[in-house]
Amino acid sequence: MIRLVTMGKSSEAGVSSFQALTMSLSGRIGVGNVAGTATGIAYGGPGAVFWMWVITFIGAATAYVESTWRKFIKRNKTDNTVAVRRSTLKKALAGNGLRCSRAAIILSMAVLMPGIQANSIADSFSNAFGIPKLVTGIFVIAVLGFTIFGGVKRIAKTAEIVVPFMAVGYLFVAIAIIAANIEKVPDVFGLIFKSAFGADQVFGGILGSAVMWGVKRGLYANEAGQGTGAHPAAAAEVSHPAKQGLVQAFSIYLDVFLVVTATALMILFTGQYNVINEKTGETIVEHLKGVEPGAGYTQAAVDTLFPGFGSAFIAIALFFFAFTTMYAYYYIAETNLAYLVRSEKRGTAFFALKLVFLAATFYGTVKTATTAWAMGDIGLGIMVWLNLIAILLLFKPAYMALKDYEEQLKQGKDPEFNASKYGIKNAKFWENGYKRWEEKKGKAL
């Protein structure tokens, strides 16, 4: 998987595998990795972390299927939006059903889900720097507007620069905190595993909550099953669909086992968390009196090693995490809108979408966290249900592509995709590419 990330180069028609990876990571790494992980611990106990890890393997499989199928249906090399027009849903739905699903995705990505990211930025900046939410909202939409009006290629370039930087910085802080509390390693991991199976005396009564919140927050953090990573995957320049499917599966592992785990370990190693029984409202463990579940746990954890720095650092990190997630949301909304409107009307439609997206983002910054999370949960539910239906129906061809890819590797080949082998019609991009590969092979002989 790691080798595949470095393969392929960007062009005027598409992006490299590395750019596609960073674009998908910009969507996966967000509020869910910081605030979401903390709320998982708050309502599911330390055992929720284990179930976040477990759901990762299922999430990686779904990411492979959805991304590989998106590469199946790439039609040409000159339009990144057309590359994803005929999505996985086309095989699951038909006629008006497909159009309605596209509209629902646009609603989720452009209206319902950006607010929760923007709200988290506003809250963290208010806590760390005392900046009013209104001021933060104006700043966020100004920077976001510059990015999305710059075009999809600029999104790829921005993600390529920002995502590795913010993730590495966040991980270095986590490593420093773990090193400072290294003697707690056996106790913390023992607590995670015991709590995950109800064997811990303190958290044994919330075993069901540990599983539920671990799965919920794990899915929210890595966006597995939502189809978001498939959009940048479709724009990547590769010779076989399975290559990007595996790259996107790898992005799930990076997201959870590095960023989510870093957040969880910072919180647990420092003991900066509360655990609440969601059913009864009883506080089982209270280490942070008066602190609401969310990014405040992570801020307090970093403050234990870097007093006065924790809140500011997490606020800045959360800004990058949430901001890159938001412009990834816009990219997805735009590619789906391209399916619904004619090419001559796309300019106007995209401009209107940008305005709606910025308005929804600003709305999220000035509203309460409860409102923002409620809207985000609705959007998340829409994305997951729509995409899982398609994944179940399209698993077989994606699996066949993986076997084809592995067989070619065993033969010492750089895998090339033959669309006709899978009965995929009108896949001109892959048909022409395979013909060129066959011609080269014939000349070599």
From Swiss-Prot:
Post-translational modification, as annotated: The N-terminus is blocked.
Keyword tags: Amino-acid transport, Cell membrane, Ion transport, Membrane, Sodium, Sodium transport, Symport, Transmembrane, Transmembrane helix, Transport
Any single Gene Ontology cellular-component annotation: plasma membrane
Membrane association type: Multi-pass membrane protein
Record keyword Transport present: yes
Localization of this protein: Cell membrane
The UniProt record lists the keyword Transport: yes
InterPro entries referenced in this protein's UniProt entry, alphabetically: Na/Ala_symport (IPR001463)
Pfam families: Na_Ala_symp (PF01235)
Described function: Mediates the active transport of alanine, driven by either an H(+) or Na(+) gradient.
Stated name of the protein: Sodium/proton-dependent alanine carrier protein
